[in-house]
Amino acid sequence: MSMDGLPPLRDVIERHGLFARKALGQNFLLDLNLTRRIARTAGGLDNATVLEVGPGPGGLTRALLMEGARRVVAIERDERCIAALEEIAAHYPGRLEIVAGDAMKADFAALAGNSGDVKIVANLPYNIGTELLIRWLTPQTWPPFYESMTLMFQREVAERIVAKPGSSHYGRLGVLAGWRTEARIAFDVPPQAFTPPPKVISSVVKIVPRADPLTVEVGRLARTTEAAFGQRRKMLRQSLRSVGGEALLEKAGIDGTRRAETLSVEEFVRLAREI
């Protein structure tokens, strides 16, 4: 038995035939010490509702419950994993809700319900992680329904999330994250911690919404960053032609010979406001 009184994860995986599926972007994290570290990074779980995407056999799910999460809502697309998750639910009566379905189609705010303290904590499937994050960063209304996000990504994606102007990693994702949130890399996780081991290092990122971000319409900022970084090697007067080009830059007071990676979040907001 493991420290939580449940069978070791390797036994659970073998018993239920849960080999990871590449098509679903699965890499199972088996080390309960690491999953508990993720849960502790999220912090303040005692009165929280936690939304978890892609729990798989439930390693992180177990850690969240061990660390005191009042309620965990686990969204799992892989039907093979449901039985393993139901065993965890039986061990923690009334605290784990399993949602069998596609996270890309989920209404996360509705799943959270009227809970005051909502946290998103997940070892996100690699093939949908970035798309989900952008959705969580760009709702029309702000502050969002969640208090924080503690998410695992490939290291390269994590670096893009926290990147600052002038960095080779700085791009659309860094602007969207920097606009409305404070994001930091909490720690790295080596490939050997997973089964099967991925080819890259993973990183856990802690993201906390800003209470009062700069005001701009979401769609305008999205179009501006998409155009600017779609041709990041070109000067802004060329890359931004589709959204206003020289006239837009002049209204925003930004030199058209600059490149996208040199602009601060505040400057991107200025541009977007003028579209």
Curated annotation (Swiss-Prot):
CDD domains: AdoMet_MTases. GO terms for cellular component: cytosol. It is found in: Cytoplasm. InterPro entries: KsgA/Erm, rRNA_Ade_diMease-like_C, rRNA_Ade_Mease_Trfase_CS, rRNA_Ade_methylase_Trfase_N, rRNA_adenine_dimethylase, SAM-dependent_MTases_sf. Pfam families: RrnaAD. It catalyses: adenosine(1518)/adenosine(1519) in 16S rRNA + 4 S-adenosyl-L-methionine = N(6)-dimethyladenosine(1518)/N(6)-dimethyladenosine(1519) in 16S rRNA + 4 S-adenosyl-L-homocysteine + 4 H(+). PROSITE patterns: RRNA_A_DIMETH (PS01131), SAM_RNA_A_N6_MT (PS51689). Belongs to the class I-like SAM-binding methyltransferase superfamily. rRNA adenine N(6)-methyltransferase family. RsmA subfamily. PANTHER family: DIMETHYLADENOSINE TRANSFERASE (PTHR11727), DIMETHYLADENOSINE TRANSFERASE-RELATED (PTHR11727:SF7). Specifically dimethylates two adjacent adenosines (A1518 and A1519) in the loop of a conserved hairpin near the 3'-end of 16S rRNA in the 30S particle. May play a critical role in biogenesis of 30S subunits. This is Ribosomal RNA small subunit methyltransferase A.
